[in-house]
Amino acid sequence: MKIALYSDLHLSVHPLELPPTSADVVVLAGDLQRPATGMAWARQFAQPTLYVAGNHEFYGSDLASTMAELRQQAQGSPVRVLEREEWRHQGVRFLGCTLWSDYRLFDSPEQREKGLQMAQEFVR
């Protein structure tokens, strides 16, 4: 199976036109751009296309509403939005999960600060 993998394209900063691909599956692994324009770009592929959101898809929003928006926009297209889900194609199992954290857990300033501290320690 041939897979075309695209990630961190940041299309709002660097627009990109891709040539047609002969891949069996297209995987969009996050950070395309905001949901509406990112999904419009994702829908260009004729192949089954998997879209796993990255942190940039959530800017100015939250996980639940952004995922709902992406799923709604994917309806009627070959794009499948994966969030803690799997999809099987030609005997291959694809798993998708966003690795983004909302540091406003329970809207508690203490929890947000603790989460940010933990993230900074992890990066070091």
Question: Which residues are covered by each model-predicted region?
Answer:
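Solvent-exposed, flexible loop/coil residues
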Residues: 13, 91, 104
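Proline-centered loop/turn at the N-terminus of a beta-strand
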Residues: 48-50, 80, 93
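N-terminal active-site segment of His-dependent metallophosphoesterases
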Residues: 1-51, 58-66
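Residue-level detector of flexible, active-site-proximal loop/helix-junction positions
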Residues: 10, 56, 88, 101
